[in-house]
Amino acid sequence: GLGDVYKRQLIIVSLFIYFLKGSLKKHAGIYYIGAAVISIAVFLLEFLPMPLFVKNNILGIFAKGSIGTAMFVAVMYTGALPKGSKLIAPLMKIRGELSITAAILVLCHNFTYGITYFKMLFIKPEALSATQLTAAIISLVLIIIMIVLTVTSFQAVRKKMQAKKWKQLQRTAYVFYGLMYVHIMLINIPYARLGLGMYIANVVIYSIVFLGYAAMR
């Protein structure tokens, strides 16, 4: 069921962080390449006939940006939880690497869906509903912010920037999280209003996650 989808994402990301945090810090480049390879493979496989189970359960969690989003949520909460907590210490160390990995995986989602929606946005915007149009525009803003934040998360780039400038730039992450929530809602609410269980659960779960974060900030 749907609860299992979220459990699966959470379990995958939690296990990834728990077992690979040291390795991610030491060999970040390998993980970035791995994430890029997965992204490209998922993108290409989307065009091939696949058993529904594989399409929904394996490719889907990458194509829909779910794993990347779950990683961003981990990064997001790292900044919101109390500094001294045991949970945070290991996460703080890999925050940059985790957000870069998440960004690479989310770009896979942007390409997979972008082929349809961005094409329509630029060629035939009237074919999109008002919510789809807004979601597509927000998506473009999100991609720009994400690329800027990702590039400046690389240590080599970060070292070249003034600490104050870098900190100010990182604050745009709040805009990113806010727009990400709006984007997710715009995609899910129209279907949720039709009474589709999966989309109703999306609205509820993402609202708890994002509004809970806002309350903690």
Indicate residue ranges for each PLM-predicted region.
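Short, small-residue-biased leader/transition segments that mark boundaries at the very start
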Residues: 1-6
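Hydrophobic cores of alpha-helical transmembrane segments in multi-pass inner/ER membrane proteins
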Residues: 8-15, 68-81, 140-152, 176-180, ...
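Short, hydrophobic transmembrane alpha-helix segments
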Residues: 16-28, 53-59
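Transmembrane alpha-helical segments and their boundary/interface "anchor" motifs
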Residues: 66-67, 91-113, 135, 171, ...
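Extracellular/periplasmic helix-loop-helix junctions in multi-pass membrane proteins
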Residues: 185-203
